[in-house]
Amino acid sequence: MSEKIAFIGVGNMGNPMAENLLKAGNKIKVFDVSKDMLAKAKKKNLETVDSIEDLINHEISIVVTMLPEGKHSKEIYLGDSGIINKVQKNCLLIDCSTIDIETSKEIGKAANDKGILMIDAPVSGGVMGAQKATLNIMVGGSKE
């Protein structure tokens, strides 16, 4: 089944991850604060958008984030334009960023309080693993 996925953070790790999701038959839209990263994503046939507002809509079933630090995850999820306030309740949030446990718990609680499913899913395997689609994903979340 093809999912409609919003992917935020298409740097060295996120770009090949999003590309592999596209190759698997999913519909992907991507966003990054770096215009250079968006240009690279576009060259890989990924559909790019210029803002979070253009990315998150009622059609999105999954949001994946791959961000460099907890403060970035916090801003994307909980900030004034945070995606927790924009997604539908049936949307699954997957944070692949390697962030501190406190930030992960804070974001997870905020999502849970709104009835949104979220999993913390940091990865290991580096850029090569992302390119070869061989990353190890360590998943944590509620039993639902």
Residue ranges and their predicted role:
Residues 20-23, 43-45, 77-81, 107-111, ...:
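Short, glycine/charged-enriched secondary-structure capping and boundary segments
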Residues 31, 66, 97, 139-140:
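Active-site-adjacent beta-strand anchor residues
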Residues 48, 93, 137-139:
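Generic preference for hydrophobic
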Residues 1-58, 62-65, 127-130:
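NAD(P)+-binding Rossmann beta1-loop-alpha1 motif at the extreme N-terminus of oxidoreductases
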Residues 52-121:
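Rossmann-fold NAD(P) dinucleotide-binding segment
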